[in-house]
């Protein structure tokens, strides 16, 4: 006589709940990563000046080569 009969279909009842939470967590993580990437892109577009964009501007360079123009080095100080 069998006193306890295990039903194999009831063991899967709790596993159907897990993928829903995993899917929601995955969607949330993807949204957060997307917002971070978008904010970095917008920061570089609107807030930070990318170097060498204005090639024809008449700004003073960051450094002055002193070997090629030694007479100009004293005038720029």
Curated annotation (Swiss-Prot):
Superkingdom as given in the UniProt entry: Viruses
Annotated glycosylation sites: 7
Sequence intervals crossing the membrane: 27-47
Membrane topology: Single-pass membrane protein
Cellular localisation: Host nucleus membrane
Keyword tags: Early protein, Glycoprotein, Host membrane, Host nucleus, Membrane, Transmembrane, Transmembrane helix
Main subcellular location of this protein, as a coarse class: host cell
GO cellular component terms, A-Z: host cell nuclear membrane; membrane
Record-stated family: Belongs to the adenoviridae E3A-1 family.
Protein name: Early E3 9.0 kDa glycoprotein
